[in-house]
Amino acid sequence: MKNKKSIIIVIVIIISIIILTFFGYICKKEKFYLEDNYYNYDMKKVSYRDINKLEKEKKSFILLTYNPYCSLKIPCDKIFEEYAKNKNITILTIPFDKFKRTEYYKTVKYALSVIIINKGRIITYLDAEKDKNIKLYQDTNKFGNWIEKYIKLK
């Protein structure tokens, strides 16, 4: 009887490992391309209407939301701008007070934030409230590595 229980436990463990591995593989985030028109350097100011339209059309893009009245000791916008220029990509920008009128505000509650959006859905974003993201705001290479975990460059 003990032997049967041991065999059943081993089988359940093996099946669990197989299932978890399978779901881990499926849930793995695949890199994606931005829309073609975002593979040229620009820090393009957009309105909340533009963002809502891009979401509705299920577009893929990078969005920077910022507070125009906030000045930081470390000029994060220069980090983002330098990266965009070096990699020849466009980052859309919107003031946070306008950003609040988008659907994305339900998820991203703080500025300064960079949001990676694929097919109209937020994949990830820099959270200004999390200590783990501070280095990404301060270093072009670290910011670039973070972006390139999700986005394929041309």
Where do the language-model regions lie?
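N-terminal leader/targeting and pre-domain segments
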Residues: 3-17, 21-58, 139-154
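Solvent-exposed, acidic/flexible segments
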Residues: 44, 69-73, 136, 140
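Local sequence-structure signature of Cys/Sec-based thiol-disulfide redox active-site neighborhoods
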Residues: 47-86
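Thiol-based oxidoreductase modules, predominantly thioredoxin-like and allied folds used
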Residues: 65-67, 88-102
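Short acidic, S/G/P-rich loop/turn micro-motifs used as interaction or catalytic elements
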Residues: 68-72, 99, 123, 130-132
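Structural micro-motif
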Residues: 105-119
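Non-catalytic, surface beta->alpha helical segment in thiol-disulfide oxidoreductase systems
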Residues: 116-154
